[in-house]
Amino acid sequence: MTTYQKIIPIANQILKKYDLCDHCLGRLFTKQLYLSSNKLLGKKLKKNSKSSQRCYICKNLFDNLNYFLNMMIDSASHYSYSSFSVGATIKPSIIDRDDVIRSKYKLKGIDGIKTDVTKELGKLFSKKTKKSFDSLDPEIVFTVNLKDEFCDIRSKSLTLSGRYVKPVRGFLQKQKSCSNCSGKGCRICDFHGIKEFDSVEGEISQFLFKKLGGTTAKFTWIGGEDKSSLILGTGRPFFVKIQNPHKRKLRAKSANLEHIKVSNFKIVADSPKKPLKFNSSVEARISTSSIIDAKLLRKLKNLTKKPIAVYEKSGKRSEKRILSIKYKKSDETSFTLFFKFEGGLPVKRFVTGDDVSPGISQILDMSCKCLEFDFHDVEVK
């Protein structure tokens, strides 16, 4: 006796007691027969059984899937994508009735009705749009609520890298988060997590929101800077992840924004999982509490001979190396320092010697203060 012949009596028992649509009946047995179409199998099993009543399990939900398909198409009309997946929310009573049938007739290892609904919606959407169904890494994800009749859509985040030059002083690197949602995104900040765009982060975010759409932008900075610092040369590298973007391609490789210039825009797989190692070349203008001379300044050369210990308030200790150092005396109580160092060295604290050893004040044996410092290069190792 074939497997098909074995399931016919069970199917007939079910149909005597319950009216089932082709989809719901076929789903109970397709896996046993290694078939792909629930509807065709259900139709075959019901060839001698006719009924005009509503399906006991789904209440003829499958006859109405085109309504939800059109809802999906409308939701996706503003998105660029090549792959998708579908999730669904259905009435608990439908799932309960499905469980009753499967339990009563000991039908194990079969798809639940929720799985079948999402599969059917996926097939219909793929056929209509020619997009690929991808359950592992889709570019957009639909959540179709068949209970309350609405469709939610989310797109896969998009990560970009780039570099920015900041030729003006008095411009912050980081943007203050929205006070209402603490950066999570709300109606007040248009779900961006920030209400203003008056920083490096703000200007880049605003540019990308206009080009790509999206909600929040999460930055990974390769080093930080003072509000008064200039970022020169090829600029400071950064990574930014855009949540729920509408577009997935950025034609612009550079942008001249109001206060900064961005270059080398490119889409990357993801932001770095671990902090990247980098070197910074800085020009710092330093004032001293006492008169300095060339002989005293020569002591600064010793800073390249051993690591600089940096102590944080948390108790963490790290070591940074000064790779090269030059100086130029400005007047009796000030000089300019040109030095290259491993990323993570706090420049102002290095000058004053505040929890940094040895610091410039310690080397010169006098109180020193960093008036301002500018970055000439940030080199990722």
Swiss-Prot record:
Keyword tRNA processing among UniProt keywords: yes
GO molecular function annotation: pseudouridine synthase activity; tRNA binding; tRNA pseudouridine(55) synthase activity
Active site residues of this protein: 226 (nucleophile)
Pfam families: Pus10_C, Pus10_THUMP_arc
Superkingdom, taxonomy of origin: Archaea
Keyword Isomerase in annotation: yes
Gene Ontology process terms (BP): tRNA pseudouridine synthesis
EC number: 5.4.99.25
Keywords: Isomerase, RNA-binding, tRNA processing
Catalytic class of the enzyme: isomerase
Catalyzed chemical reaction(s): uridine(54) in tRNA = pseudouridine(54) in tRNA; uridine(55) in tRNA = pseudouridine(55) in tRNA
NCBIfam families per UniProt: pseudo_Pus10arc
Function: Responsible for synthesis of pseudouridine from uracil-54 and uracil-55 in the psi GC loop of transfer RNAs.
PANTHER family, sorted: TRNA PSEUDOURIDINE SYNTHASE PUS10
Similarity comment: family membership: Belongs to the pseudouridine synthase Pus10 family.
Protein name, as recorded: tRNA pseudouridine synthase Pus10
